[in-house]
A protein has these predicted regions:
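Outer-membrane beta-barrel "beta-signal"
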Residues: 216-219, 245-257
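Transmembrane beta-strand segments of Gram-negative outer membrane beta-barrel proteins
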Residues: 27-42, 65-69, 195
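Transmembrane beta-barrel strands of outer-membrane/channel proteins
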Residues: 38-40, 56, 69-75, 115-119, ...
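Residue-level signature of outer-membrane beta-barrel architecture
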Residues: 26, 40-42, 58-60, 104-106, ...
């Protein structure tokens, strides 16, 4: 646990230090962009379920820096049939994610050198905890009025708690160097609708993690959107009693502050 805490603290300190340095030398005007999204479902009667997912995305723009902070949570309760035939409400999904990224802007606002860190805690996933740190280069490869494509790549390091035996709570610790790549496509095909595709890969010797988030957003008002999406998380190295791929379909209400 200390290893994860130290890694996460180091990333956050690096982000804070870089931002403070830029503020002290350049004293630019600060610009904040904050969006929050929430989705929840509850059913009663013959089937009782409760599910919740939420996300907050904060972007801080300065003259030569762009910082981004993301936090999300997924929680679900379901009725589960026991060995004796009775049904009992149990938690079937509980996942938390947080990331921080600090990017130094180069010739234009889209080319950058970045430092990135993330931490995932998944009570029911193939990995109970997964922490990464990386640095690299990012750029915008398509820049049109309604269509953009951003991508980044760089080396990094990961720490993972692999669930080897769920019933006996046997955890195997893994760590090692990795290469991280990520891309995001945005297509505003009408004035009120936007398609978004995010892809990411963290390639290491022990495990490769792939992440995909596909979504369609439609405007309800200037500040509010309805968002329908589908996420895929895939790990290549999992225990025999674990699935390598987790998927989530969601409908969220998004508010832009």
């Amino acid at each position: 646990m200390k290893m994860y805490t130290t890694a996460a603290a180091g990333v956050l300190l690096a982000v804070a230090a870089s931002s403070s340095l830029a503020q002290g030398e350049l004293k630019p005007e600060k610009t904040w962009e904050v969006s929050a999204e929430l989705g929840a479902i509850r059913t009663t009667g013959n089937t009782e379920t409760e599910s919740f997912n939420g996300k907050i995305d904060v972007v801080h723009r300065m003259e030569n820096w762009k910082n981004q902070y993301i936090a999300s949570a997924l929680y679900k309760n379901d009725q589960v049939e026991q060995d004796d035939g009775t049904e009992q409400t149990e938690t079937t999904a509980e996942k938390y994610f947080a990331s921080a990224k600090s990017a130094y802007l180069l010739a234009d606002e889209f080319s950058n050198l970045f430092v990135y860190g993330s931490h995932t805690h998944d009570e029911f996933g193939a990995y109970r905890k997964y922490t990464t740190v990386s640095a690299g280069y990012g750029a915008r490869f398509i820049k049109r009025e309604s269509l953009t494509l951003d991508a980044e790549i760089g080396p990094g390091y990961f720490w993972g708690d692999k669930v080897e035996d769920e019933d006996n709570d046997i955890i195997v610790k893994e760590e090692g160097f990795m290469v991280r790549t990520a891309a995001e496509l945005k297509w505003a095909f009408t004035d009120n609708a936007t398609f978004n595709q995010k892809l990411g890969a963290e390639v290491a010797e022990d495990n490769t993690r792939y992440v995909s988030d596909t979504s369609l957003s439609t405007k309800i008002s200037d500040r509010m959107q309805m968002k329908v999406g589908y996420t895929v998380n895939h790990d290549t190295d999992v225990a025999d009693d674990k699935e390598g791929t987790d998927t989530t379909t969601y409908i969220n209400l998004v508010y832009n502050f």
